[in-house]
Amino acid sequence: MTNNDKIVAIVTSIAVICISLTVIFCDTLVLAVGVPTLVLLWLVFLGWINNKKLDKGEMRRAITGSIVIAFFIILIAISKNPDIYSNNKEIFSLFFGMVTTIIGYYFGYRSGKESKNSSGNE
């Protein structure tokens, strides 16, 4: 096991513990903000530890990951308390549209990049 693998394992363990403690002991607002922020920081760290620099792809991955986590937290909150959605329909509709756009852009960019790389290798 290399030093990078050990560091990644330690930071991942710390991230899982922090996220678990946030889920168990915090209210919904802290959960909705804290967990995506922790995921963002964790994904940025994983991108940085790979080659000691961050490129656009690493930041896209980190931002997409944190927004998708926020999306799932909102879905769970709505399933537990449907009144949240009925009181804030416009905000949730805008957020769901934003998430759809971000995911489409992320995967569209990746597939375009992969097809460009595969056509360049032939």
UniProtKB/Swiss-Prot annotation:
It is found in: Cell membrane. It comes from the Archaea. InterPro entries: Cytb/b6-like_sf (IPR027387). Keywords: Cell membrane, Membrane, Transmembrane, Transmembrane helix. It is a multi-pass membrane protein. The keyword Transport does not apply. Its main location: membrane. One of its GO terms (cellular component) is plasma membrane. This is Uncharacterized protein MJ0321.
